[in-house]
Amino acid sequence: MTLYNEEDILLQLKSADPNLQKKAFEQIVSFYSEKLYRQIRKMVLSHDDANDLLQNTLIKAWMNIDLFRGDAKLSTWLYKIAVNESITFLNKQRAQNNISIDDNDTFLIDKLESDEYFDGDALQMKLQKAILTLPEKQKLVFNMRYYDEMPYEEISEILGTSVGALKASYHHAAKKIEEFLNHD
């Protein structure tokens, strides 16, 4: 098993050798696919949609790898692409199904309940339903902080929001989830 070294991989991506570039990107795919899939899946819920969006994310990353400046970590850049792809997908889905923002919670909860790949118990289902009632930004912040254990600084880079605003968003999300779990 080869160890993942981001500095070496970035050097290989910048090389003139297409085989070296391809090998480096294959390592990126191998290292980040599962993490990106989980982030996307938390946003779109559907296994099939998450797989499609993961592929779109990786294709977009490959096609634009020369635009990666190295200001942030590669993972941050990939997460940003994945989040943007997911938000675009959700907005298109909402428009295609003629779903208002207010009705979106019900739509997503119905989707979660009918998901054949969901293997959690009743408490996990209740937690997921609570998360689905959050506004999109709070949902993103909560998932990245709680499930992915990302530092606020990295979330800030991905979402383009200040650390203070993210902390407030996470706090509000946690309170809303707590209220949902205690009253439902």
What do the predicted segments below correspond to?
Residues L67-R69, K80-I101, H172:
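Arg/Lys-rich amphipathic alpha helix in sigma70-family domain 2
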Residues D52-I59, A72-N84:
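Structural recognition of an alpha-helix C-terminal capping motif at a helix-to-coil junction
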Residues I87, Q138, E153, E157-H183:
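DNA-recognition helix of helix-turn-helix
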Residues T2-I9, Q96-G120:
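Internal acidic/polar
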Residues M1-E34, H183:
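N-terminal module of bacterial RNA polymerase sigma factors
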